Amino acid sequence: MKKITAYEIALSGLAAALSTSLLVLGTVTPILLFTAYLVACVALMLPLSRGSYAGYVFAFLTTGLLTLLFCGFSFLFELLPFLIFFGLHPLVNELQIKYKWKKWLAFFIKALWFDGAMYVTWRFAFGMTTVVALPEVAVVVLLLTLGTALFWLYDYTVFKARAQINALVGRLLRKK
């Protein structure tokens, strides 16, 4: 097993702190919640930029736990999309690159995962709390069409952000 360096520990701590701060802000300011998911996802890429999978897992688990502790466990449904998809997506992208998975196959699997995560979120978070009753088939069709199209844009953006994060961390660590 590879030894974790001080830089990787620092990047993991920074990723956890940034992600937690963003998710707490998004949770208490509902209009910023989706933006908080996205930016927290980018912040979690910091340990992955140095190839630290253990640091990433630490940052992800710490982010989820601290956000629930700071906001209260009653906000679990607001954090559900982050916990079941957005927080884990950078790791899956990194594994896709490391093991050279076919792009179309990886996209198909990740799109189904995204659609499933959004369906679970709709069932638990919105389906139980909204007064408007949407037909089940309409929600599934909407998720499979619009959700997959939005996921394509999101996945493309996350891959571009990954390249920028890797370049930024590489420059910062070379400046010793």
What are these regions (language model features)?
Residues 2-50, 54-58:
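Hydrophobic transmembrane alpha-helices
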Residues 111-127, 148-156:
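Mid-bilayer segments of alpha-helical transmembrane spans in multi-pass integral membrane proteins
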Residues 9-13, 35, 57-61, 79-80, ...:
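Hydrophobic alpha-helical transmembrane segments
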Residues 33-92:
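Alpha-helical membrane segments and adjacent membrane-interface helices in multi-pass membrane proteins
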Residues 19-24, 64-70, 112-120:
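Aromatic-anchored segments of alpha-helical transmembrane domains
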Residues 82-119:
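Short helix-perturbing small/polar motifs within transmembrane alpha-helices
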